[in-house]
Regions:
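C-terminal ends and interior cores of transmembrane alpha-helices
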Residues: 84-97
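Helix-loop-helix hairpin linking two adjacent transmembrane segments in secondary transporters
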Residues: 144-168
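Helix-to-loop junctions at the C-terminal end of transmembrane segments
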Residues: 61-74
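Residue-level signature of mid-helix packing/kink "hotspots" within the transmembrane helices
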Residues: 28, 56-64, 148-149
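Hydrophobic core of transmembrane alpha-helices in multi-pass small-molecule transporters
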Residues: 20, 89, 100-116
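Intracellular juxtamembrane helix-capping segments at the cytosolic ends
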Residues: 115-129
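Primarily marks hydrophobic transmembrane alpha-helices of the MFS/SLC 12-helix fold
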Residues: 76-79
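Pair of pore-lining "gating" transmembrane helices in MFS-fold secondary transporters
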Residues: 6-29
Length: 168
């Protein structure tokens, strides 16, 4: 196993980090700001849930079209597009001026985080590894769990200092 890790560290680290960074578009992370978002935009729980559902469905409907880029371009090039797109989404999301902007921000987070980041990770690793694909995937999937374990605590600590918008 160590030989496999050493020989393929670059690809495994890339996949792990992509799955880790997908956390910013996952429900567990966005939900950390749910109360503040509802308060800021004067939304009920149901209204926010409906908006979130629409953003998620929009992302799901867009994913096959955007994901097609992975079929026609090198995965590393797609990653070089998806990473800055997710970073920009994280930066603009908390400062959207109205509910329409909030919906767009949620859509972008869901599309580039939960959707494209994960799809790119699995595609990069799936293409690179043919004989050991299952082993490789099993080594990048913990990026999701690492995000679930570490990022909520980091977000809560940072938001206690900078507020929810500053933490994003």
């Amino acid at each position: 196993m160590l030989t496999f890790l050493r020989a393929n560290f670059r690809w495994l680290a890339c996949g792990f980090l992509l799955t880790l960074f997908s956390s910013f578009g996952q429900t567990f992370f966005i939900g950390l700001s749910g109360s503040e978002i509802r308060r800021t935009f004067h939304l009920s729980g149901g209204a926010f849930g409906g908006l979130y559902m629409l953003a998620t469905l929009g992302s799901a409907l867009t994913l096959p079209w955007l994901g097609r880029l992975l079929d026609i371009m090198p995965a590393w090039r797609v990653a070089l597009f998806v990473l800055p797109a997710l970073a920009a989404s994280c930066l603009i999301f908390p400062f959207m001026p109205n509910v329409v902007g909030l919906a767009i921000g949620l859509y972008l987070l869901r599309l580039f985080g939960q959707g494209m980041m994960t799809e790119t990770a699995y595609t990069v690793v799936g293409r690179w590894f043919s004989a050991n694909r299952g082993r490789a995937i099993s080594l990048i999937v913990p990026g999701h769990q690492t995000g679930e374990a570490v990022l909520p605590l980091a977000f809560v600590l940072i938001s206690s200092w900078l507020g929810w918008q500053g933490a994003w």
